[in-house]
Amino acid sequence: MVSGSGICSKRVVVDARHHMCGRLASIIAKELLNGQSVVVVRCEEICLSGGLVRQKMKYMRFLRKRMNTKPSHGPIHFRAPSKIFWRTVRGMIPHKTKRGAAALARLKVFEGVPPPYDKVKRMVIPDALKVLRLQAGHKYCLLGRLSSEVGWNHYDTIKELEVKRKERSQALYERKKQLTKLRAKAEKVAEEKLGSQLDVLASIKY
């Protein structure tokens, strides 16, 4: 997944935790236009520069933008973190053209890490990480926290599900570590039993 240098054939899963919203959206928008399929998980952990009060005031100003005669015609004000991020990416893509619509269709966004993506290797994007891009000491807030302040009702539910997922993941890791240890022990015992026969096996590259 490198912009302009080639397309990865399989879908890329990006862990959005502690990435800056705009920087992450711009990189993903470019990849989508290049033909890459992208899944973004943990959207509630995306960072916005500026404190929570400031960001909430900005969002409340955005809520006042509507069509006077028929507000349901737009603009649509999303509350869920995944949909807010999706809209940010949409703003960086010519989504009203055929190419742009196809690019946007290649994007999937989620709060938390739902199956089957909990068993898939996830990647980060260094160019968008908060620790590398936000000035030290600068205020920031999480997108999930902002969403919960403006009408998103599932913040606590997602947090509970994430705790359960991490517990399952830790148990799986411990089991895998134990199996690796047993395998290494079994290989050592086999080497001691085989002795000189190992040289014969090595010569035929077994």
Curated annotation (Swiss-Prot):
It comes from Arabidopsis thaliana. CDD domains: Ribosomal_L13 (cd00392). InterPro entries: Ribosomal_uL13 (IPR005822), Ribosomal_uL13_CS (IPR023563), Ribosomal_uL13_euk/arc (IPR005755), Ribosomal_uL13_sf (IPR036899). GO terms for biological process: translation. This is Large ribosomal subunit protein uL13y. GO terms for molecular function: mRNA binding; structural constituent of ribosome. GO terms for cellular component: cytosol; cytosolic large ribosomal subunit; cytosolic ribosome; plasmodesma. The keyword Transport does not apply. The keyword Cell cycle does not apply. Gene3D superfamilies: 6.10.250.3250, Ribosomal protein L13. PANTHER family: LARGE RIBOSOMAL SUBUNIT PROTEIN UL13X-RELATED (PTHR11545:SF39), RIBOSOMAL PROTEIN L13 (PTHR11545). It comes from the Eukaryota. Keywords: Ribonucleoprotein, Ribosomal protein. Belongs to the universal ribosomal protein uL13 family.
